Amino acid sequence: YDMAAVETLGWNVLTNRPKEAAYRAPGAPMAIYAVESVVDELSQILNLDPIDVRLKNAARKGRKSSYGPTFDDVGLIETLEAAKAHPHYQAPLGPNQGRGLSAGFWFNFGGNTCVSLNVNTDGTISVIEGNPDIGGSRASISLMAAEELGVPYEKIRTIIADTASLGHNDITDGSRVTFSVGLATIKAAQDAIQKMCGRAAQIWGIDADAVTWEDGAAVPAGENAGKFPPLSLAEIAAVSFETGGPIAGHFEVNADGAGVSFGVHLCDAEVDPETGATKILRYTVFQDAGRAVHPSYVEGQMQGGAAQGIGWALNEEYIYGKDGRLQNSGFLDYRIPVASDLPRIDTVILEIPNPGHPYG
């Protein structure tokens, strides 16, 4: 939120019981729960619509965040406005039913990445990157490579190599892979395009500066370049051994400029006043995705995050015995939500481009 002054005090507490491992949303939902609970209390005291209170206090472009950086393009206002205009927010509630609202935030991350892109003689493309795919990133990387090269998506194969096969790659974390690996892939594709334009110039007998790349093919550029039919990527690749050997692009980057990401969730729940049994009736997620490279995977991430949050709130708990041993170490006893526990989780993707990335 847009706060004139803020002081944050935190503690690091050493605990020996839970093990340390990779897990989605480290720490963020806990802090957001505290903040959003206070905003809801203020809305009730002031008798104001909770979305209106958030809109009045929402972070905006050019304002400094509580953790240091200055916000660039911020999607919080757009997600709040989308939630307020959605039929879910206006739908009536029945007895023992309530509606919850929360805004959320993640700062995102760039980091160090190396990507190699090989143009194969059959016209296919191999993209080699070093970050495991845990959320559909291979599809997004392939789409960006196809877009930059101007070839069909089916021609791209993204390979997760072991990290000894490339330069340094930071780990898959912090929502960094589509941003940072995507940026390196785009630049590696541009490197390969420059080399393919050079090969086309060699075939035509003209200067490389007189060749440009359009729609997956090299074309002569300018009045003095001569008139030659376009040479497609597949045609250039097929004769690459005769024009200088294999064609590959490479790029390494320490990516900065990762944009912040905001979301708003609406949840309708029904509580049995006698037993306390809780049922989730309706759930809608509004998310600023920057640019949804692969919308189906973006929706899956939104739905998976919502299901995980519901599990935290209603079901999931570590239970320890007096001896400090975990009593529910398996999914038989550690109760995560299953499909029968959840309604359809609706998604609304908003695209507020990040100026720090070629594709937003």
Where in this protein do the model-derived segments appear?
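C-terminal catalytic domains of large/alpha subunits in multi-subunit enzymes
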Residues: 1-106, 122, 144-360
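Conserved beta-alpha junction segments in alpha/beta enzyme cores
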Residues: 99-125, 129-132
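Short, small/polar residue-rich loop motifs at catalytic or cofactor-binding pockets
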Residues: 111-113, 135, 263-265
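P-loop NTPase nucleotide-binding module
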Residues: 139
